[in-house]
């Protein structure tokens, strides 16, 4: 029997949009929007400090020269995930049956007022491992950064928020969240963060600066997700304009962009992540949001 769940988040944000703009935002015709194929991979224990350490990561020298993680690894993320998920490297506690990678289709569009981002992927087989997050079988999040003010954001995407002393890393403080070194919303050194949680039926809009904050952003209009058979699709709608802690999006500009999926009731570092990419709004980018 085909299981179909429809989960809608962001009701409060949508009501605010209704009050301010007179109508709910209408999603674009996704059949007319080009999809970018991006393979997420299981990263294990590979924090920012590791990718900068030349004795352990051969790409550290290239990183220092200004090359991006995607320049070297975009075609091998699935293979990287296999090595790490198996415990061959960078994972001291491998989970039997853990999916090494998740291929995702990403689509983007805008209507002059709102940005629409759609993610779709097939549900990997369950590992059978203990559930880390009982409430949420799936979570998906993406981050945006503007201007490369966060060190290495232009090269490493969201990796600048991932540190060896953050919770769920070996020997780390369980209370320490993601953060940016020298992070400051006032100085523009932050990531704009969006997340959708399946079980809680909620969308969140926060930021990562000196610590991660899951709420307080004002750009999110709605987050809607559904599972149709073995396929998930999640659509985020956010205003192009933003308040404090939000990245304001402008036509003709590109932004640092990365995303991650917590699958199989996972939590913390046990997610699948993208490399760093560019989101272009009427501009060049790995993912392009054209006006519809």
Model-inferred region functions:
Residues 81-98:
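Short cysteine/histidine-rich metal-coordination sites, predominantly Zn2+-binding motifs
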Residues 123-130, 244-245:
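Short amphipathic, basic-aromatic surface patches that mediate peripheral association
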Residues 62-77, 101:
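C-type cytochrome heme c attachment motif
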Residues 25-56, 70, 78, 141-195, ...:
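Acidic/polar low-complexity flexible segments
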Residues 223-230, 246-251:
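Exposed beta-sheet edge/beta-hairpin loop segments within beta-rich domains
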Residues 113-123, 232-238:
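Short, well-ordered beta-strand segments enriched in hydrophobic/aromatic residues
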Residues 1-24:
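Gram-negative bacterial Sec-dependent N-terminal signal peptides
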Residues 174-226:
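Short helix-loop boundary/capping segments
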């Amino acid at each position: 029997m085909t299981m179909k769940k429809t989960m809608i988040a962001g009701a409060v944000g949508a009501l605010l949009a209704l009050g301010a703009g007179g109508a709910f935002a209408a999603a674009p015709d996704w059949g007319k929007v080009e999809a970018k194929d991006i393979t997420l991979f299981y990263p294990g224990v590979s924090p920012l400090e590791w990718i900068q350490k030349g004795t352990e990561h051969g790409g550290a020298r290239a990183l220092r020269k200004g090359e991006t993680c995607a320049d070297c690894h975009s075609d091998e993320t699935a293979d990287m995930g296999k090595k790490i998920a198996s415990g061959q490297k960078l994972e001291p506690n491998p989970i039997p049956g853990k999916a090494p990678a998740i291929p995702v289709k990403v689509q983007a569009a805008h209507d002059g007022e709102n940005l629409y981002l759609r993610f779709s992927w097939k549900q990997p087989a369950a590992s059978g491992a203990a559930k880390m997050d009982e409430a949420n079988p799936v979570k998906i999040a993406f981050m945006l950064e503007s201007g490369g003010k966060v060190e290495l954001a232009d090269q490493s995407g969201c990796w600048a928020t991932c540190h060896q002393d953050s919770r769920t890393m070996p020997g780390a403080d369980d209370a320490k969240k993601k953060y940016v070194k020298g992070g400051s919303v006032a100085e523009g050194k932050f990531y704009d963060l969006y997340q959708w949680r399946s079980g809680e039926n909620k969308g969140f809009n926060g930021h990562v600066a000196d610590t991660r904050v899951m709420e307080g952003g004002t750009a999110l209009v709605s987050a809607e997700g559904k599972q149709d058979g073995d396929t998930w699709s999640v659509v985020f709608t956010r205003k192009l304009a933003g308040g404090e802690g939000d990245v304001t999006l402008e036509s003709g500009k590109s932004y640092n962009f990365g995303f991650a999926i917590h699958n199989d009731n996972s939590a913390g570092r046990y997610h699948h992540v993208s490399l760093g990419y560019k989101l272009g709004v009427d501009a060049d980018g790995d993912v392009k949001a054209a006006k519809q």
